[in-house]
Amino acid sequence: VLFPPTRSERKTPATLSTGFRPPTLVLLPLLRESLEEYAEREAIKALSGAGTREAFADWLDCPPSLRRSKLLALARRRWERKLQAARRRLEAPAATWPEVCHQVAMEILGYRRNRVPMANLAQRHPLAEVADEGGDVEALYEEEAASWKLGAVRPQNHPRARLAQYLRLVEKRPDWPARLAASEPFPAEKENQLRKALKLSELKRFLAEDVLASQVGGTRFDTLVADGFLPLLAARSGKDLFSHWRHWYPGDAPPQLKTFLKEIELIAPDGPEPCSNGLLQGGLQHFIERESP
């Protein structure tokens, strides 16, 4: 029988009412990704599949306004999942804001392929240690030498490069999680506010320069904000930051997702709004649900 352990069973073996302790095979330590990440991976595979074209027809049968509302409903579900995950991390025993931020940032800088080894390093080497003692890129890299996935990794995304990038950030901004907390944006008064009304360009500049010391840029910066910073800030404050997350700038995403949004006529050079994180996330959620049994 496969079942998730209760909170008490995580420390003590399962025991039946008769007192018998059945043999237990613990698989959780062997899970290299979260179930959500497995689902994302399968959805991304489906984006290149033969069945993707058929999905376009289903969407094009709807009027444009309904297509948009359907996609945003999917994006909202994805946001709620990220928010729930952020809450769990912040509410975990002994969790602190600086350490959760430290772990999340390192995981996201590891990209999908090297998220787990980066998470392992973040847990073994707390932010306070890295800030006080610095860090040696080669020593950190060797700690997870057997775990790195290097096939088809671009030089700028190599784990050594991302470790060096994060160490530079901590050297320049050892208090970066506190600075992030100070950046907490105000919730939108209306869910349909656009980037200008939400002052996202000012927030982006503050996060890039004051919080991250200009050490993380490009689409990985936007992914760090959308997947890490905004859910954590919302979980910490209790404010609804969905509009900020929904209108945030596109981060790293499979090119097939943009193709999907173009095919269902939700983004175009002369369209009503630019491509955004929320539209991409809604598209990804569509394929996750489509591939789920």
Name each model feature, range by range:
Residues 70-283:
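Hydrophobic, aromatic-lined core segments that form the binding pocket/scaffold
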Residues 1-3, 291-292:
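Hydrophobic/aromatic-rich, well-ordered segments within soluble, folded domains that form packed cores
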Residues 283-292:
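Cysteine-cluster motifs in flexible loop/terminal segments that predominantly coordinate metals
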